[in-house]
């Protein structure tokens, strides 16, 4: 994954449940991933990440 890729990141919430962030990876460093998606910018601690991968571009609107 690199900045500018469309990604999905599954991460653990403080409650222990998991959730996904889907959108453009706008920054990544040793401690934090920042994903810009429909819910706005999500700052995700790398230690909370369960899985992450690059996904294809969103389909065109109909």
Listing of model-derived features with the role each one plays in the protein:
Residues 1-62:
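Conserved RNA-binding domains used in RNP assembly and mRNA/RNA metabolism
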């Amino acid at each position: 994954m690199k900045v500018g890729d469309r990604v999905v990141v599954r991460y653990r919430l403080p409650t222990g449940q998991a959730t996904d962030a889907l959108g453009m990876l706008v920054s990544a460093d040793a401690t934090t991933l920042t994903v810009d998606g429909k819910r706005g910018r999500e700052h995700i601690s790398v230690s909370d990440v369960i899985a992450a991968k690059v996904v294809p571009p969103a389909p065109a609107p109909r």
